[in-house]
Amino acid sequence: MLRSLLLLAPMVGAAVAATEPNSPACPGYRATNVREGHNSLTADLTLAGKPCNTYGTDLKNLKLLVEYQTDERLHVKIYDANEQVYQVPESVVPRVDGKGGSRKKSVLKFNFKANPFSFQVKRGREVLFDTSGSNLVFQDQYLNLRTSLPRDPNLYGLGEHTDPLRLTTTNYTRTLWNRDSYGIPENSNLYGSHPVYYDHRGEDGTHGVFLLNSNGMDIKIDKTKDGKQFLEYNALGGIFDFYFFNGDTPKDASIEYAKVAGLPAMQSYWSFGFHQCRYGYRDAFEVAEVVQNYTQAKIPLETMWTDIDYMDRRRVFTLDPDRFPLEKVRELVSYLHKHDQKYIVMVDPAVSVSDNKGFNDGMEQGVFMKHQNGSLYKGAVWPGVTAYPDWFHPDIQKYWDGQFNDFFSPEKGVDIDGLWIDMNEAANFCTYPCLDPEGYSIENNLPPAAPPVRPNPRPLPGFPDDFQPPAASKRSVAKGSKVGLPGRDLLNPRYQIRNDAGLISSKTINTDLIHAGEGYAEYDTHNLYGTMMSSASRQSMAQRRPAVRPLIITRSTFAGAGTHVGHWLGDNLADWKHYRISIAQMLSFASMFQVPMVGSDICGFGGDTNEELCARWARLGAFYPFFRNHNEITSIPQEFYRWESVAESARKAIEVRYKLLDYVYTAFHRQTQTGEPFLQPMFYMYPEDKNTFSNDMQFFYGDSILVSPVHDVSQTSVEAYFPKDIFYDWNTGDVLRGRGAKVTLSNISVTDIPIHIRGGSIVPIRSESAMTTVELRKKGFELLIAPGQDGTASGTLYLDDGDSLKQSASLELEFKYRKGNLQIKGKFGMHTDLKINAITLLGQTSVPRQVTLSRAGKADSKFDPARQSVTIKTDLSLNESSEIDIN
């Protein structure tokens, strides 16, 4: 949400990193006492000369652990001999079993040089990672390690950022330090930290490198003076905890990463519907009016959201008694539920320091962050002076559960269906050192004044009497091991990362605070704050409704966040630049970071959108996994019904999205089971085609649907790249034979978007769309068969009850087409009354002589010469195998 009030705060320039942190004066380490096993290697590392102490104190004694964890994964860990240096807690990022591999069978090989110590990771004769060009630096507040790279490498990942999908390889610094970052600027640290990169080498394969370290860091990609390419880590602490993943293809590397970071959480069927929100809905009447307007405009609305407007003076776990009184909010939620729609609200981590239940309970249980002298740490956010939950506190889950059980009680509170968590980097408007949060809040009018109380301005048919106008006015500190070394400067480390907010404590929680429990420092765990809130919130939502999958959307993330939550891409702007970059952002999270429930604020959050941009964005946004229109209080309203062309675009977009919803649900489910990305950059599908490596303006929605959006103002055409394959136009059925070149697609109105089905695909779609996903799930299916260049095609369909956390039964179908024969087989664990009502075969030039169904005899078919397709009307059960011959 908008951070415009920050202009009143003192501005601090970004810290300037050292020009050459990896000084040749540092001696490096000497490896001794090397021991090798069938799947591991250990060694002692001893400082090889006089300490350089560039940005801290050199540690004299380190340990090396190498594990061949699987045939495709290698673990290399360099840590202090006494194990006092902070390591990412296993309670936050669980570790995988590392005992299943062997050195002989591993695709990845570890080689090292003893003095000065350096190491290589190789795949066959190919060097993937090589630290021999510089000496290892391991200090109490600074780590440095550099690997050489091939010339002009294809590198991806290292989020969160709004830079191109394929990373710049000259003079590029990617800083990982989570921060509130309105406008999501380029070349800047944003809300999340994902220290994993993918190096794609075309036909030679792909590999991934994950550094499990939550400390602030600069990752530099550049060339030496003599032109040699490198990637360099510069971290403020922690250890070197590397995981190397082999991948014959980019997909394989992503799958391997999922095995370490964790498989994504499966989402409910309804969560893939259309969501509407705005910061600035003044009261419950306006929220209800928006719901009504979508219905009248015949634009399907699945879920209505409310921003912090619903709160009493912006205090979490409260309702504004005048504008969002409990009885009206409960009536609103009841109305939505009766119409098969959902309701979601925002919860921030910061709790108002005032007389309210959230604060009083937290103080009583002692779960807020404290200074080292035991006094309450205070910041300033929307409600004014605030306290911050300590997610490491032993009683924090009890506290959080209690607030959820009370405020979100289905019987007496706000019965939400999902949760939106924001400001959890954690954000703090008051600039460090923030000695007077009370004075800052007064000076900056926190909390902001609420809008005037008003009666409902117009009737809302179908809503309770409370929502109607009055009759007269009717009108139309370290406690154990792996926690952190003592004596560090936790506020001003000598090495300063390139944090665009300035000092590392600027605009966030002070980094010298010590967490309860084990005694971790905020300095080390800052990047974990949002993910720990996500984990606690998921548990709190789950104990409210233990049987169903909780939808939780967060702003701040760390590696592994996808196991708990989805992510929206933050406070973007209503312009074409942010429209375009949303594609690369989405692909990074869904394909590379294993956070597949992801999307941008459609039509833009900050600034005024316009009709053309919003119409285009409605079509593009329908291919985001998380599909939500949202903007802020000072911008013009931008609900899809505000312009007729946008309304038309939205109706068309949602119709396609809903028809494809089960196709996407199937692919998304597969990712939660195997890690195989369901949303993919073009080079994931064509890994040997160099023309796809930098393409972040097109993407695959599942394995079968290629999306090629128009991406600039006043354009009705787009140059789209088509690899050497066969494609079918979604709307016309026209066959396009790709030649590994760009093709100009023309006459694309603002309500359309180019979509093509990749040859070799069988796409199961719903026979028609619907106004809600409950209604949609009652519709039958149609199979679209798009034969590949060899005349074959295949596809899958997964069905379950759409909501249960643990499925008692499911249906998994497999479709295979070859030489006019379609076979449908599967695992029929769940009974359904749904049928396959039609089969459409694309790329045909004439009507078939005969169509035979294995269980129903002959069937009628219809040839469409304009679409070059044959459609067969069927009544095939999904509960048994079937076979169809088309001759």
Swiss-Prot record:
Pfam families found in the cross-reference section: Gal_mutarotas_2 (PF13802), Glyco_hydro_31_2nd (PF01055), Glyco_hydro_31_3rd (PF21365)
Segments of this protein annotated with the region Disordered: 457-483
PROSITE patterns, per the entry: GLYCOSYL_HYDROL_F31_1
SUPFAM superfamilies assigned to the protein according to its UniProt record, in alphabetical order: (Trans)glycosidases (SSF51445), Galactose mutarotase-like (SSF74650), Glycosyl hydrolase domain (SSF51011)
Domain of life: Eukaryota
Keywords: Carbohydrate metabolism, Cell wall biogenesis/degradation, Glycoprotein, Glycosidase, Hydrolase, Polysaccharide degradation, Secreted, Signal
GO MF annotations, alphabetized: alpha-1,4-glucosidase activity; beta-glucosidase activity; carbohydrate binding
Listed EC numbers: 3.2.1.20, 3.2.1.21
Enzyme class: hydrolase
CC per GO annotation: extracellular region
Glycosylated residues in this chain: N171, N293, N373, N747, N879
Leader sequence segment: 1-17
An example Gene Ontology biological process: polysaccharide catabolic process
Catalytic activity: Hydrolysis of terminal, non-reducing (1->4)-linked alpha-D-glucose residues with release of alpha-D-glucose; Hydrolysis of terminal, non-reducing beta-D-glucosyl residues with release of beta-D-glucose
Locations listed in the record: Secreted
Active-site residues (renumbered): D422 (nucleophile), E425, D571 (proton donor)
Family listed: Belongs to the glycosyl hydrolase 31 family.
Biological role: Glucosidase involved in the degradation of cellulosic biomass. Has both alpha- and beta-glucosidase activity.
The protein, known as: Probable alpha/beta-glucosidase agdC
Organism expressing this protein natively: Aspergillus clavatus (strain ATCC 1007 / CBS 513.65 / DSM 816 / NCTC 3887 / NRRL 1 / QM 1276 / 107)
Name of encoding gene: agdC
